[in-house]
Design a protein with these regions (language model features):
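Bacterial Sec-dependent N-terminal signal peptides
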Residues: 2-27
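Flexible helix-coil transition and linker loops at the boundaries of alpha-helical arrays
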Residues: 10-12, 46-63, 92-99, 130-149, ...
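Structural signature of alpha-solenoid helical repeat junctions
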Residues: 14-16, 21, 55-64, 69, ...
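Structural motif corresponding to the intra-repeat A-B loop/turn of tetratricopeptide repeats
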Residues: 31, 70, 77, 111-113, ...
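Hydrophobic/aromatic packing residues within the alpha-helices of TPR/SEL1-like helical repeat arrays
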Residues: 34, 41, 87, 122, ...
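Single-residue signature of alpha-solenoid repeat helices
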Residues: 37, 83, 117-118, 125, ...
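Terminal, low-structured helical/coil segments at or just beyond the last alpha-helical repeat
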Residues: 143-147, 154-158, 162, 166-228
Length: 228
């Protein structure tokens, strides 16, 4: 038990100083300064490690938050394998966290979305996505509300596209088109006319394949979900 508990009501979280460093790391993350954010999260982890004798559920929450932050920084810096490790570590402290879960899903997707496609990794990403929707957790990440349920739906659509499943299977909630429609129901007319698509309201355009149509839609949706 920390000696500062009597004077610091946040001692069970690791203390005010530690929480301030963690919040500073998230501020840098939200500002897009991922390298600085990663360094600050690592500083927070080092401080938390020095308090190894403190074993409370609230301290576990702080550790989970730190590892989630390190995971997201690595994901933004294109280190998906390291990101996966830290998200998994975070879940060992706090299982039901939207931000951690969608980060882990994204890490598995990035690891699987290579040439050749690693369907094992993609399948895990899909499993996590279905679990997010069935678990009843919130629909946005409290530390960065730009990370929300739309990211999960887009990742589901991209994952099914990577596997070659372009369907709209409403019974099983699978297929790239199914998850596209969860993001934007306006594409529902593709069910009846799958070989044409009105691109940006500029007139009907013909495509060589349904695969090409789905790919173009995914690119358009990415620009909406992840605006520049």
């Amino acid at each position: 038990m920390l000696s500062c508990e009597a004077d610091d009501p946040k001692s069970f979280y690791g203390g005010t100083d530690l929480l301030d460093i963690v919040e500073s790391a998230w501020v840098s993350f939200r500002d897009g300064d991922y390298v600085i954010s990663l360094e600050t999260f690592q500083e927070a982890k080092d401080m938390a490690d020095e308090q190894g004798g403190t074993d409370t559920l609230l301290m576990h929450a702080t550790y989970g938050n730190i590892h989630t932050g390190i995971g997201w920084c690595n994901l933004r810096l294109l280190n998906a394998d390291s990101a996966k490790w830290h998200f998994t570590k975070s879940q060992s402290y706090v299982l039901y966290s939207f931000g951690t879960s969608v980060g882990l899903m994204a890490a598995y997707f990035e690891l699987g979305n290579e040439i050749p496609i690693d369907t094992t990794q993609i399948n895990v990403a899909i499993e996590i996505g279905h679990w997010i929707f069935s678990s009843g957790m919130g629909e946005e990440f409290e530390n960065d509300i730009t990370i929300n349920v739309s990211d999960v739906k887009l990742l589901m659509a991209r994952s099914y596209y990577a596997k070659g499943n372009l369907s709209n299977n409403t019974d099983l909630e699978i297929g790239a088109l199914y998850w596209i429609l969860q993001l934007d129901p306006g594409y529902v007319y593709l069910n009846g006319d799958p070989v044409t698509w009105n691109l940006y309201d500029s007139g009907t355009q013909d495509f060589d394949s349904f695969d090409e149509i789905i790919l173009m839609i995914l690119r358009a949706l990415e620009s909406e979900v992840f605006p520049a």
